[in-house]
């Protein structure tokens, strides 16, 4: 059996060497010739998998180590009888950590208290839903917009207009849909961006085209009160250099790039391939993940809640480092800039997640205990 895989998928040998030969390629350069003889194709979001890539090949199974599937032509898969799997929720916790770290940075810049802001989450799937649960656990006010879930479940969902008009912070976590009843391509265009409240913060860690980047650039040129945090970009790996300069935080599509999340994605498509082939799983992710470098954090019962929040989050991840690395990589040479974008992702340092972080409290501190629990930490 021949497996063709994106070279940046972690733990390829550990999970897949027992199935046959593995050939690795840069994800953006995968073409029909590369996959012609493959039985299994393993990709990330940078590879468009469609009729043009697969027609005439032997591919029977496609696995993507990502939550999103907008790079997969699922209609063609159905037509051609190709089975597929994504990795839902694999990097959700990493994205939540990214959002929390970004909020801490913005709060320090603006001198505001995070519990006093109103949060709007657009898209309540694996990532957005996890973020909503964390924010609710912290006791913060959260409004949620998700028309698909609202139609299926009812509940306390609000419109996008309500989010724009009432929320100080808007975090986007939608898939990219260009058609259908609820398209998300340019979900925030010029008209929507104009409705942002004074001093609003906008975070996009979903897909670049969910926000009209040209309209956002023009807004930021006109409104210094608005902060934008972008991890995803229209046309990436090419980036609008002016827009990047105007963003308070700018990063190269790494919000979900925790070590745990990336390896979890590989494990999930391994499990799906085992089901497809009808074989038992022989490899367990828990046996492959290294121990976290930070064994435990200790807090005194008198610790200020805001200080504890910042300490716990930044002990695991601080997006300011990624922002600085990204800005240093930006170049007026388009080819050099695209290469640097991909290189930052390829050589991304190991980063763990807050979830599971061991925390010891000295003394009775119910509010601190609640904060630790909301973040996903474990009291020891």
From Swiss-Prot:
Q: Which residues bind substrate?
A: 45, 66, 257
Q: Where in the cell is it found?
A: Cytoplasm
Describe its partners and assembly state: Homodimer.
Q: What is the name of this protein?
A: Erythronate-4-phosphate dehydrogenase
Which BP terms does GO give this entry?
pyridoxine biosynthetic process
What's the Enzyme Commission number for this chain? 1.1.1.290
Tell me which UniProt keywords the record has, alphabetically: Cytoplasm, NAD, Oxidoreductase, Pyridoxine biosynthesis
- Indicate where this protein is primarily found: cytoplasm
Q: Which organism is it from?
A: Pseudomonas putida (strain ATCC 700007 / DSM 6899 / JCM 31910 / BCRC 17059 / LMG 24140 / F1)
Q: What class of enzyme is it?
A: oxidoreductase
Gene name, please?
pdxB
Q: Name one Pfam family in it.
A: DUF3410
Q: Name one GO molecular function term.
A: 4-phosphoerythronate dehydrogenase activity
